[in-house]
């Protein structure tokens, strides 16, 4: 009589699937617990594979967390682009440019509220060894056009092209706008504004975006 061998988790991974499976498990840990929850040994256990098998794909926790950070950044960018794509193609060029900037900020805050664990992980660069001192260079050289900061930069470039923002006031606005929406996002998920209800949070968001828009002129 032939005994049928049960399939183990290790049996199911082949042709490079293990790397993606490890990343998927790590993303789920980050989603529920933020960057501190991403531990290579835990991910290896979830996948049901040996330490050596996991280390062939991610040499240490920093490598795994770096991959999750890139994933989280990409999802944040997706949320911003979704808001941008919803901006109606009507009104003056100047109005559309301002509306697109507001949409970018709204998408950023939307993501923080919907995915706080991934949002925190998107900024865990110090734990991965990635340099974060110059976000402009990171956006241009490491991850290309689909990066949250690059998306923000383009919407601000559109403001200059539309005549809303004078070129001599362009420098530094990327970082200022980013600081504003990131700061509010952090207050919403980790700070004293975390207890505010959804309606109150949206009101505060609207006021912040109003202030940014007024400051452009």
What annotation goes with each model-predicted range?
Residues 1-17, 87-94:
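N-terminal intrinsically disordered/low-complexity leader segments
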Residues 17, 21-28, 32, 46, ...:
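Alpha-helical structural segments
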Residues 41-46, 54:
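Append "Primarily bacterial transcriptional regulators
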Residues 95, 131-164, 171-175, 203-214:
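Amphipathic alpha-helical packing segments from all-alpha helical-bundle domains
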Residues 111, 154, 158, 178-196, ...:
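Amphipathic C-terminal alpha-helical segment
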């Amino acid at each position: 009589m032939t005994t049928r061998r049960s399939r183990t988790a290790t049996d199911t991974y082949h042709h490079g699937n293990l790397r993606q499976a490890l990343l998927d498990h790590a993303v789920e840990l980050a989603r529920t617990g933020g960057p501190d929850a991403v531990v290579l040994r835990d991910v290896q256990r979830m996948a049901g594979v040996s330490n050596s098998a996991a280390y062939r794909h991610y040499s240490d926790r920093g490598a795994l967390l770096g991959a999750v950070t890139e994933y989280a950044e990409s999802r944040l960018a997706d949320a911003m682009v979704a808001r941008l794509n919803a901006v109606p193609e009507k009104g003056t060029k100047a109005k559309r440019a301002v509306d697109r900037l507001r949409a970018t900020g709204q998408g950023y805050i939307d993501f923080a509220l919907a995915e706080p664990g991934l949002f925190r992980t998107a900024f865990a660069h110090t734990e991965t060894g990635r340099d974060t001192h110059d976000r402009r260079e990171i956006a241009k050289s490491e991850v290309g056009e689909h990066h949250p900061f690059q998306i923000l930069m383009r919407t601000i470039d559109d403001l200059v092209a539309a005549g809303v923002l004078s070129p001599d006031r362009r420098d530094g606005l990327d970082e200022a706008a980013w600081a504003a929406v990131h700061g509010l996002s952090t207050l919403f998920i980790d700070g004293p504004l975390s207890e505010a209800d959804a309606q109150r949070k949206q009101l505060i968001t609207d006021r912040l975006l109003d202030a940014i828009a007024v400051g452009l002129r």
